[in-house]
């Protein structure tokens, strides 16, 4: 988790001049502590279980394992296992794209997603990317859908960090996350 945090902090440092040109260098990275009561960074183990041939055959065409969504954090690092496919990103999201591009695992590679928090912080200079996990094709020899494992590190700013931008009112990262959680239950 420490190495993931360091990598995400480095990515934020590299993005900052473009994302938040008025910031002092290091402002974004410094707003993300890994440990302590103010920290909100999270490491999540994602498991999509295998499915029997009968269960897989009962699903409608175009089913997915995780529906289209964006991440709430600043940056997500996704570690995928080689040979376990399914992650897709919307192509050209500024234009309401319905086409999806696969993000196949690469040995030693890490998929990086910009999240909603960084999109807000940057006044939309960086867009959070819409992504999903599609249902892979069943194995031809068995008809079963294979398992998928991945690790996601969500680099979320500290609860007390102030997200300030020109287009929207300031909000603490803690209140931002609480607002996102609440929005799930108000629909």
PLM segments and residue spans:
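C-terminal flanking tails of non-heme Fe-dependent oxygenases
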Residues: 5-187
């Amino acid at each position: 988790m420490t190495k993931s945090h360091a990598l995400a902090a480095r990515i934020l440092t590299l993005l900052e001049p473009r994302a938040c040109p008025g910031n002092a260098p290091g402002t974004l990275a410094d707003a993300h502590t890994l440990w302590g009561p103010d920290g909100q960074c999270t490491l999540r183990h994602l498991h999509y279980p295998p499915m029997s041939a009968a269960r897989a055959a009962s699903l409608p065409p175009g089913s997915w394992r995780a529906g289209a969504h964006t991440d709430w954090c600043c940056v997500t690092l996704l570690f995928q296992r080689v040979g376990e496919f399914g992650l897709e990103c919307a192509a050209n999201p500024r234009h309401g794209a319905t086409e999806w591009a696969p993000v196949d695992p690469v040995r030693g590679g890490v998929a990086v997603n910009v999240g909603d928090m960084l999109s807000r912080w940057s006044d939309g200079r960086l867009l959070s990317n819409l992504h999903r996990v599609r249902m892979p094709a069943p194995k031809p020899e068995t008809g079963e859908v294979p398992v998928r494992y991945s690790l996601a590190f969500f680099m979320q700013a500290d609860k007390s960090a102030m997200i300030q931008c020109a287009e929207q009112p300031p909000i603490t990262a803690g209140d931002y996350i609480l607002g996102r959680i609440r929005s799930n239950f108000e629909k």
